[in-house]
């Protein structure tokens, strides 16, 4: 597997606040910020394993739900994706397109984390009984996760998340799908070519990947030109 270097980068704030149910309208695809990535890495929670997996592999939530430890080769730093969980039918299904079946290379930060997480259960992500996560299970898990992050980073740990009436959200929350999109964005900044990114993400049509890369190109075009100016300035100075 190739070495997937994932840098920490500052990205624009997410807008979405909750998990969209399966089959609902598409969620906004804003990547999460560098600070939010750090929250995921540094905050122990039952949902941390799911968040780390989605953020640093780009798997779909359905793919992550169906994932078993046998699908992960930590020595080779790869995940074999061959199935997904249908939340409506409540059963595992094969991907809708050949592109969905793939081997995903994962960065060292995820490999090292997963080495500490093997717990003897069949599924990588599971409920307290060791079974696959349901839609409701995901919803409860993620709501709890956002509440904990809100207490720690919004209130500096000075409030009780179970306070009667609840706590207003002071942080920008994010969804599992945003973590998948963030992984694609990280690949862009790491210089991963669009064909490799398409394979990693399991996009049926490369135009989807190209659309993401093109949008990022437009957003950061000025910064690239500034780097060119800096390079040319140094080059001209050295030749003079």
Locations of regions flagged by a protein language model:
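C-terminal secondary-structure termini that scaffold catalytic or DNA-interacting sites
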Residues: 76, 89-91, 95-101, 105-110, ...
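Short, charged hinge/linker segments at domain and secondary-structure junctions
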Residues: 2-27, 82, 156-167, 226
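Conserved tyrosine-mediated DNA breakage-rejoining catalytic core shared by Y-recombinases
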Residues: 20, 30, 34, 67-116
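Catalytic-site neighborhood detector that most strongly recognizes the C-terminal catalytic loop/helix
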Residues: 23-24, 31, 85, 111, ...
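Basic, Lys/Arg- and aromatic-enriched nucleic-acid-binding interface segment
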Residues: 10-67, 75
């Amino acid at each position: 597997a190739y070495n997937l270097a994932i840098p920490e980068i500052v990205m624009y704030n997410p807008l979405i606040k909750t998990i969209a149910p399966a089959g609902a309208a598409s969620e906004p695809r804003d990547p999460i910020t560098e600070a939010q990535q750090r929250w995921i890495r540094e905050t122990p929670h039952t949902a941390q394993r799911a968040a780390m997996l989605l953020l640093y592999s780009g798997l779909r939530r359905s793919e992550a739900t169906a994932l078993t430890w046998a699908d992960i080769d930590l020595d080779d730093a790869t995940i074999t994706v061959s199935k997904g969980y249908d939340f409506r039918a409540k059963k595992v299904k094969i991907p809708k397109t050949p592109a969905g079946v793939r081997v995903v290379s994962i960065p060292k930060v995820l490999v090292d984390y997963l080495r500490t997480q093997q717990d003897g259960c069949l599924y990588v992500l599971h409920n307290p009984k060791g079974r696959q996560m349901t839609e409701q299970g995901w919803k409860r898990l993620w709501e709890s996760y956002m509440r904990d992050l809100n207490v720690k980073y919004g209130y500096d740990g000075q409030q009780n998340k179970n306070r009667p009436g609840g706590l207003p959200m002071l942080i920008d929350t994010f969804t599992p799908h945003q973590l998948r999109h963030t992984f694609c964005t990280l690949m862009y900044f790491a210089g991963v070519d669009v064909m490799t990114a398409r394979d990693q993400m399991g996009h049926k049509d490369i135009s989807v990947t190209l659309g993401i890369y093109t949008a990022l190109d437009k957003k950061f075009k000025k910064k690239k030109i500034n780097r060119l100016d800096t390079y040319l300035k140094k080059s001209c100075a050295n030749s003079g």
